[in-house]
Amino acid sequence: MALFDGTRLAVLDTETTGLDPGQGHGLVEVACVALDGGEIGETWSTLVDPGRPIPPDAFAVHGITDRMVRDAPGPAVVAAELERRCAGRVLVFHNVAFDLPFLDAFMRSAGHGPLLHAVVDTLGLARGFFGQGGNSLGALATRFGLPAEAAHRALGDALTTARLLRVLAARWESERGVRTVAELAAASQDALRLTSRRSRVG
């Protein structure tokens, strides 16, 4: 797809101990999928020791246990690898408002700076077409018939997000005239702001 020509992206997903890094919750898994010229390339994922017990409600979502993360790489190793894999790339998330605060808190805790990259949010791209509801990653994967991956594990969700991005980008290109990844990033953020404003008014 012409929109992706010459552009390098990193599709990221996380699994966590809870919903708010400000309350001490942290990463238990992170994944990165390279997307070069629109094609899925190298993938990487790792478990992360959050330094606290994984609560039952978090385990119920992703199935990751304290025993599984016990021998995970240290934060400095994971942060350095994540920084390397994201270098020079536009970042892609499904719901950046959830993942990025966790990643930034993790990077700071490991002595690294935040991931200051342009961002495309597939949640925003979906809301731009379908409105506020029904835009979970699983629901969108079903809507578009995307291959089933390991849901609520970081690599499975990152791969699904990468495939979803290609589907949604094609629609934004053909139906809304978006021509570059920079325009796609702006469109995703604009859609998130607009739907958020409508939900507050409604």
Show the residue positions of the predicted features.
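Acidic, divalent-metal-coordinating active-site segment for phosphoryl/phosphodiester hydrolysis
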Residues: 153-167
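Active-site catalytic microenvironments for nucleophilic, acid-base chemistry
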Residues: 106-109, 128, 164-171
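Non-transmembrane, interaction-prone segments in cytosolic or luminal domains
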Residues: 42, 47-50, 88, 101, ...
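Conserved non-catalytic scaffold segment of RNase H-like nuclease domains
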Residues: 1-117, 130-152
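Acidic two-metal-ion nuclease catalytic site recognized across multiple nuclease folds
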Residues: 1-4, 163-202
